[in-house]
């Protein structure tokens, strides 16, 4: 019999004892007889009221214990002292002071794969006090069993210029660090947890150690030579040759998007358009443009011809200018799936804010990092039942192409120039409008593979972007709308615990 049942039995015993006293006293009158008749009704009412209150308290206790148990089981590598504090904090937060009953000590027991939590609350009675039962002890116990599954997570994080304001970048770093710490706990590595990072802005930096087999090394892609007239310079045949002509610059690791529809797909790189073309921002004119870093050989040629002219690159030296062929490649290199906690924390801390927002580019690379397909091979197969995969996408703004009122019609980004029509149009506004549908398409592609997709709009007021991100998430419950700097850490902590592959057993 549970504690509530024991208290009810005690109340019934005391009630019968009281009836016995009345029966032994034969000097009563009608009032006493009436009182005796009334007492069963009062007792029944008292038992009903206090029993209902007791079960309500038990429900409060169980809910609070569930929250605490999930928090503890979601921190597999943490110390016992930390877990005890964590459990108490979550229990307190979910057992409000307005709840009935005063909770006693929280008991935590840690097994290999099972976390057991119990607590008891003391509940003052109402009507049962008449029969000498002044309080009741109501207890609850839960077990949380960790499933022995692996976890692969990729955080696709906005590193655009707007993240540098209002403390947003630091808040994001702190939140992402919190997620890593929760999942890894005190362990420097865990065999079954692997996390990747994809910082994005106007593109993504895949790193200079990206496999050459996935890069277009010879100019085979249809977009490789679109900005230059290579036929006029026989010693230069592709963008790699052009980098070699600049003695103080080399490729920084950013790549262009593949031609449509490959820009939205995880098709392995094999040949031609499936290969990635290196980022190479051309030297532009000095007036009305963004990226002027070389003297034009013949300024009378006109905007387009001057930009295509390769002669100015031959044996060139750029010096200290911040402009050049890597202009716009401001992002830190992505981090493939790894279980190296220190590496993850270091790469998160190194992120910086610069550039415009290309959500589909970042999201597509997040998918490729978690995919079992090349160019990254760290991810396990989608149909592997022993692993859960998740992508966390955070943005602080709408998709922006970086349009311009010059002949290029935009800044140079991962999509090249708008004038080249790689977004299906040469109109700047129409090209920018294509970015939202692309984002939605990639979201669906990711979800179709069974990958869990979380989305966060960070201090975003634009309702269209909010709707886009909510639709991208696996479910509305996995979309988090515009948290403050302080709330962002709570969001990442909630996501970390949701990803802990837990089930409750009682």
State each model region's role.
Residues 2-11, 52-59, 68-123, 178-211, ...:
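Short amphipathic secondary-structure patches
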Residues 2-84, 161-164, 473:
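Alpha-helical assembly-interface signal, strongest on the long, hydrophobic N-terminal helix that forms
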Residues 2-5, 13, 126-166, 175-181, ...:
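Low-complexity, S/T/G/P-rich flexible repeat/linker segments used as non-globular hinges
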Residues 16-37, 102-104, 110-153, 163-166, ...:
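Acidic, polar low-complexity linker/tail segments
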Residues 71-73, 116-118, 139-145, 152-156, ...:
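Soluble periplasmic/extracytoplasmic beta-strand elements of cell-envelope proteins
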Residues 77-81, 151, 160-373, 377-389, ...:
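Divalent-cation-coordinating short motifs within acidic/hydroxyl- or histidine-rich contexts, strongest
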Residues 91-99, 212, 442-506:
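Von Willebrand factor A/integrin I-like adhesion domains
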Residues 120, 156-159, 198-201, 394-397, ...:
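Active-site-proximal beta-strand/loop segments in catalytic clefts of secreted hydrolases
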């Amino acid at each position: 019999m549970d504690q509530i049942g024991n208290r009810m039995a005690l109340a019934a015993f005391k009630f019968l004892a009281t009836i016995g006293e009345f029966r032994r006293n034969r000097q009563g009158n009608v009032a006493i007889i009436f009182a005796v008749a009334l007492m069963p009704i009062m007792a029944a009412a008292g038992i009903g009221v206090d029993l209902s209150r007791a079960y309500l308290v038990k429900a409060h206790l169980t809910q609070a214990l569930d929250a605490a148990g999930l928090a503890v089981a979601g921190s597999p590598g943490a110390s016992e002292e930390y877990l005890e504090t964590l459990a108490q904090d979550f229990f307190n937060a979910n057992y409000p002071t307005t709840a009935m009953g005063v909770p006693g000590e929280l008991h935590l027991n840690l097994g290999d794969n099972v976390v057991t939590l119990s607590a008891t609350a003391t509940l003052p009675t109402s009507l049962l006090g008449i029969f000498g039962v002044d309080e009741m002890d109501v207890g609850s116990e839960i077990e949380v069993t960790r499933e022995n599954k692996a976890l692969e997570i990729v955080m696709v994080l906005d590193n655009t210029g707007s993240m540098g304001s209002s403390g947003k970048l630091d808040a994001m770093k702190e939140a992402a660090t919190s997620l890593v710490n929760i999942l890894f706990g005190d362990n420097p590595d865990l065999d079954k947890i692997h996390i990747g990072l994809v910082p994005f802005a106007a593109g993504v930096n895949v790193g200079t150690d990206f496999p050459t087999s996935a890069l277009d090394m010879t100019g085979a892609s249809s977009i490789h030579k679109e900005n230059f007239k290579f036929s006029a310079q026989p010693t230069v045949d592709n963008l790699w040759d052009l980098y070699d002509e600049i003695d103080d610059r080399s490729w920084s690791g950013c790549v262009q998007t593949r031609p449509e529809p490959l820009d939205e797909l995880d098709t392995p790189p094999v040949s031609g358009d499936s290969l990635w073309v290196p980022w190479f921002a051309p030297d532009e004119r000095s007036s009305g443009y963004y990226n002027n870093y070389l003297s034009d050989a013949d300024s009378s040629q006109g905007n387009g011809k001057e930009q295509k002219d390769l002669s100015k690159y031959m044996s060139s030296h750029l010096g200290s200018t911040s402009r050049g062929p890597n202009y716009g490649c401001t992002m830190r290199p992505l981090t493939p799936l790894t279980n190296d906690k220190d590496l993850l924390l270091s790469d998160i801390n190194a992120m910086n804010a610069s550039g415009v927002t290309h959500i589909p580019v970042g999201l597509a690379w997040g998918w490729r990092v978690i995919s079992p397909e090349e160019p990254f091979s760290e991810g396990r197969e989608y149909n592997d039942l022993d692993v859960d995969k998740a992508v966390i996408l955070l943005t602080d703004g709408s998709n922006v192409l970086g349009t311009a009122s010059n002949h290029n019609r935009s800044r140079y980004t991962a999509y090249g120039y708008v004038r080249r029509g790689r977004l299906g149009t040469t109109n700047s506004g129409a090209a920018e409008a294509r970015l939202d549908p692309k984002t939605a398409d990639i979201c669906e592609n990711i979800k179709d593979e069974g990958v869990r997709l979380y989305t966060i709009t960070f201090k975003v007021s634009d309702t269209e972007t909010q709707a886009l991100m909510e639709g991208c998430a696996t479910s509305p419950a996995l979309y988090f709308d515009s948290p403050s700097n302080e709330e962002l850490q709570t969001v990442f902590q909630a996501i970390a615990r949701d990803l802990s592959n837990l089930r409750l057993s009682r």
